[in-house]
Design a protein with these regions (language model features):
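Short gly/ser/thr-rich secondary-structure transition/capping motifs
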Residues: 87-91, 104-110, 149-154
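Glycine-rich phosphate-binding loop of ATP-dependent small-molecule kinases
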Residues: 1-65, 70, 179-191
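ATP-dependent NMP and nucleoside kinases share a basic, alpha-helical "lid"
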Residues: 94-98, 104-140
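ATP-dependent small-molecule kinase phosphotransfer cores
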Residues: 44-102
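Short, high-confidence coil segments that cap the C-terminus of an alpha-helix
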Residues: 7-8, 101-103
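An amphipathic alpha-helix signature
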Residues: 52-56, 131-139, 149
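Short, acidic/turn-prone active-site loops that include or flank metal/cofactor-
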Residues: 40-43, 129-132, 153-154, 174
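Small-molecule kinase domains that catalyze NTP-dependent phosphoryl transfer to phosphate-bearing small molecules
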Residues: 101, 119-120, 143-188
């Protein structure tokens, strides 16, 4: 599948857990881009009866927190779910890209590189947060360091993501990230 659409510029946006992807996506929307979130698409898919039946069959639950607990502790279950859900997310993402009224579309995909989705976009941006801010970010998400580390293990290391990214947006805080995205949009005359 290809997410590229004629007369649109598709940016894949990614980063590790708690890197500021969602914040970056909000800034891109603020500065004029159409935005999509793979996590939001997944949440909508999980509401569909057919998907709920499949989740119940494989994982015994449809509760998001219980699903997360299982897939982050059982790699086989995570892989099975990813193989099932990723094509559906991409199909819905492509539909939304085609419907977008704006030429610039930023698609936040946490596993952009891991799922080889970076080959389906025009440009890929990696969001990297200052590691010194991790304790504050954990507190803001009400996430323990143990859960954070378990989830981080399911993603590629930042250095591997950086090697495949076209642009790396390193930031110290939300204000810094917003300023960098604004400059990026201005530089490319995207809003």
């Amino acid at each position: 599948m290809n997410l590229r659409v004629k007369n649109k510029w598709i940016i894949g946006l990614t980063g590790t857990i708690l890197s500021g992807k969602s914040t970056a996506l909000a800034y891109f929307a603020k500065y004029g881009a159409a935005t999509l979130s793979a996590d939001e698409i997944v949440a909508q898919l999980y509401k569909k009866t057919a998907i709920q039946k499949q989740l119940k069959k494989w994982l015994g639950t449809t509760q998001k927190d219980q699903i997360a607990k299982q897939i982050f502790t059982h790699p086989g279950k995570r892989k099975q779910l990813e193989n099932f859900i990723h094509p559906l997310v991409l199909k819905e993402g492509l539909k939304q890209i085609k419907q977008a009224k704006k030429k610039l579309v930023v698609f936040e995909i946490p596993l952009l590189f891991e799922a080889d989705c970076d080959k389906m976009t025009d440009l890929n941006i990696l969001v990297v947060a200052d590691p010194k801010t991790l304790p504050l970010r954990l507190k803001g998400r009400q996430m323990s360091r143990a859960i954070y580390k378990a989830r981080l293990k399911t993603q590629w290391p930042e250095v591997e993501k950086a090697a495949r990214a076209d642009i790396i947006l390193f930031h110290k805080n939300k204000k810094d990230l917003g300023a960098k995205i604004k400059r990026f949009c201005e530089a490319f005359d995207l809003f």
